[in-house]
Swiss-Prot record:
Highest taxon above the source species: Bacteria
EC number(s) recorded for this UniProt protein: 7.1.2.2
GO cellular component: plasma membrane-derived thylakoid membrane; proton-transporting ATP synthase complex
Site location (Required for activity): 363
A Pfam entry, by short name: ATP-synt_ab
UniProt xrefs under CDD domains: ATP-synt_F1_alpha_C (cd18113), ATP-synt_F1_alpha_N (cd18116), F1-ATPase_alpha_CD (cd01132)
Physiological role: Produces ATP from ADP in the presence of a proton gradient across the membrane. The alpha chain is a regulatory subunit.
Name of the protein: ATP synthase subunit alpha
Reactions that this protein is recorded to catalyse: ATP + H2O + 4 H(+)(in) = ADP + phosphate + 5 H(+)(out)
Quaternary data: F-type ATPases have 2 components, CF(1) - the catalytic core - and CF(0) - the membrane proton channel. CF(1) has five subunits: alpha(3), beta(3), gamma(1), delta(1), epsilon(1). CF(0) has four main subunits: a(1), b(1), b'(1) and c(9-12).
Organism expressing this protein natively: Synechococcus sp. (strain JA-3-3Ab)
Gene transcribed to yield this protein: atpA
Membrane topology term: Peripheral membrane protein
First-listed, main subcellular location of the protein, grouped into a coarse class: membrane
Amino acid sequence: MPTIRPDEISTIIKQQIEQYNQEMQISNVGTVLQVGDGIARIYGLEKVMASELLEFEDGTVGIALNLEEDNVGAVLIGSGRNIQEGSIVKATGRIASIPVGEALLGRVVDPLCNPIDGKGPIHCTETRLIESPAPGIVDRRSVYEPLQTGITAIDALIPIGRGQRELIIGDRQTGKTTLAVDTILNQKGQDVICIYVAIGQKQSNIAQVVNILSERGAMDYSIVVAAGADSPAPLQWLAPYCGATIAEYFMYQGKHTLVVYDDLSKQAVAYRQMSLLLRRPPGREAYPGDVFYLHSRLLERAAKLNSRLGEGSMTALPIVETQANDVSAYIPTNVISITDGQIFLESDLFNAGIRPAINVGISVSRVGSAAQTKAMKKVAGSIKVELAQYRDLEAFAQFASDLDEATQKQLARGQRLQEILKQPQYSPLSLDQQVAIIYAGTRGYLDDIPVEKVSSFKQGLLSYLGTAHPKYGEIVLSTKQLTDEAEEILKTAIAEFKQSFLAKAA
């Protein structure tokens, strides 16, 4: 029979009394009235705040979106399969936040920054709110530094600056994602941190982008935030804000960041789905009334900070998909009005073999020209006018049988300019290479080269410049200008190469 030791019992009781804490925990709780389709209606939670995180009995997290008189409408982040009518819900008193830090570089994460690449946990010491206010007017400065995309047509005609928001818009399968990925690849060695946000994409497409970035060594300075087509609507809605939050962390440390949102049409569709299930009144195209605010509060977070805040920047490249080239639909017009310009890709140009399929006529950059390098400004000044004139003449030439010599020359020049702006995917060019190609095109060096041989001439000239005249590239890349010395070297190189090229062709 065990012996009872009173001294031990009294010691334990004393310890329990000493450790007793009178502090009461008051929780704001409610009960689930209805659940389904990723939406829960909850009774109670009288003191809940808009966008507050809610915790369900099974551990599922929700966000309170509709605060009504007798119930709260919440979206579920997760499957919510184990939530039943009558389940207890607790308000957490917190707003959605994610861990941020250098440890995210090279990783693929979901919109809550949980790793999904199988490379183990991510250890971040800091957290940031997913929804945070954009920098104010006094915190910004105007865009003045170029963000080189490596795509000649963009850097010459529609230049982008650090801190700008440039929309990439076009039908499906016109090369929108390719443009964005090329831009990320071109940031290698430029000290720019890139965030690629995939919203509602097929898993195979996301895997393809990650593979390309890994193969080219771009994942060292990139982060991929993925909310695939099979992700719940709330995660597709949150994904762009997660990308912006990660970029903000680096921006406020004085670093340069680039965020690609691929694509905001699918985010708007996910938000429409949530809003209709929450019984919010539908507006144009069944989108809710605040769909403009959905995108404006996201894109306004892109900025070029002033010197007091460290001169960091966040450049945004939102992508929007159109139906049958209709840029006057609701979401495209909204995003066009928010951004600082757009790059319009056309399926007709793409099918005609002009890739990147940029329609130079309606593509604009409202602030990027201030950030264009002097070297590019010097050579690209006339190319836009010449291309516009070529398009007009091309339409006219279809109906006219006999054209005067000047018109024929202009058409021939335009064809060659169009040819030099063609570029294969995943092969961005450096500034000195772009300047050399445009210089050769606008100064008439290609006028007597057959159109079908312009592409091989271009490739040959670039390799010849790199091997025979490396000083040209050194001058342009170090000064960002086409100095008199560099121009003389370039003229000599083009003349030498052209002579050998024509001799071989003959």
